[in-house]
Amino acid sequence: MQNGTFAARYDDVISDPKMRALYGDSGYFNVGYWSAATKDLVSACDALVDQVAAPISAGARVVLDVGCGLGAGTRRLAARFPRARVVGANLSLWQLRMTRGRGARAVATDAARLGVASNSADAVVALESALHFDTRDDFFREAFRVLRPGGVLSTADMLFRDADVIGPWMVPAPNRIADLREYEEHVRAAGFTSVASRDVTPVTWTPYIDAMSSVFEDQNVVRAIASSVSHYLLLTAVRP
C-alpha cells in the first residue's frame, strides 16, 4: 500500500466516532498501561508513555518518537526530557498538524527511510507504531543507523495470531510474526545488543479490550479483536 493511502486510511480509523468516544480530545491512540491506580484510558496512555520512556537516559539530547500519532505522547516525552530535542515523526500530514498543535516538534518522514542524520539520536521510540511500518525490519535498521553508540531503542508493540482481524492493510506481511523471541531476533539482526523484552498483555491489551467493549455494540467483533493478539510487548535494545 502506498504511504499516502495508508496514512489517509489510518486517519479515518483514528477519527472514527467509536474511537473518539474512547479517547476524546486527549491526543492519544494507544491501549495504555493499566494498574490498580489507573483512573481511565487517558491516564493509562500517560502511563504507557512513561513505561517506554523509562529506559532512556535523563541526559538524552535527541529523542525521536517515530509514528507519533496525534502528539500527546510526544508532548509527554518532551516534558519528561526538558533538556532534549524531542521530535515526533509521521507520514500523515493531519497527524503532524495535530502534534504541532499540541506544542510538540514533528517532521514528515517515513519510518523505513528516516530523514535523520546517522549517529544523531540518543533514543528512538516507537509506541504502538512499528507494527504498521513497511517494514518493521527496515525501521529497526534505520533506528540503528540514526542512534549514537549507546543509544536506546524503546518500543511498545503488538504481535498477532491473525492480523487480518484488525484489517489486512494495517500490518504488512513481513511484520506478521506471533512469537516474542522471534521479534527479539529481528531486533538483533539489525545490529542491536542488550535486547530485552517483556510481555505486558495482562496490563495493556486485556484491560483495553474491556474499555473497547463499552463503545462497540457487536461484542463478537470485540472478542475477535481480543484474540487476534498473541503478545503485547515492551522492548529495549542498545546500539553498540
Locate the predicted segments by residue.
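Short, glycine-/aromatic-enriched active-site segment of Class I SAM-dependent methyltransferases
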Residues: 158-174
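A short glycine-rich, Lys/Arg-flanked "PGG" loop and its adjoining helix->strand segment in the class I
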Residues: 137-152
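Conserved catalytic loop of SAM-dependent methyltransferase domains
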Residues: 196-217
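Conserved alpha-helix/loop element of class I SAM-dependent methyltransferases that forms part
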Residues: 42-59
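A short acidic, Gly/Pro-enriched loop at the edge of an enzyme's catalytic core
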Residues: 112-124
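N-terminal auxiliary segments of SAM/dcSAM-dependent transferases
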Residues: 1-22
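Short alpha-helix
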Residues: 175-191
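Class I SAM-dependent methyltransferase SAM/SAH-binding core
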Residues: 64-113
